[in-house]
Curated annotation (Swiss-Prot):
Main localization, broad class: cytoplasm
Function: Microtubule inner protein (MIP) part of the dynein-decorated doublet microtubules (DMTs) in flagellum axoneme, which is required for flagellum beating. May serve to reinforce and thus stabilize the microtubule structure in the sperm flagella. Involved in the regulation of sperm motility.
A GO BP entry: flagellated sperm motility
Protein name, per record: Sperm-associated microtubule inner protein 10
Ranges in a coiled coil: none
Amino acid sequence: MASGKDTCPILPKLTNNCSDENSDKLANKCEIHLPRFSLKQGMIPRHYVMPWKQNMKFRNVNLKHAEACGIHAGPLEDSLFLDHSERLCHGEDRKVVLKKGPPEIKIADMPLHSPLSRYQSTVISHGFRRRLI
């Protein structure tokens, strides 16, 4: 019993003025992002927001610099540290950060247990192996 009155009105067609690059950026903005955090550590602060994100006087300039450098400046993820964990999803790549520091001797086959160890520090060796990954 559908009549002509029950149909939806015809909507005007929108012109597509966007280039392919802009449509890719819009598609990327609609993706769901789940933040990643490191394990909880006592030395990491409970909550820390970078000062340049709180500076309202030069906010537009700071956002332009962040965009030029490829740093995420979204409103939902302001904190660099949250609940004694470090945010891992919008920072520098971990391998790049490790290259900036002093060179270290990397032992790939470090034993997990040594009978000569006074404290049998398996926790330290596990942490070392985890950092190599």
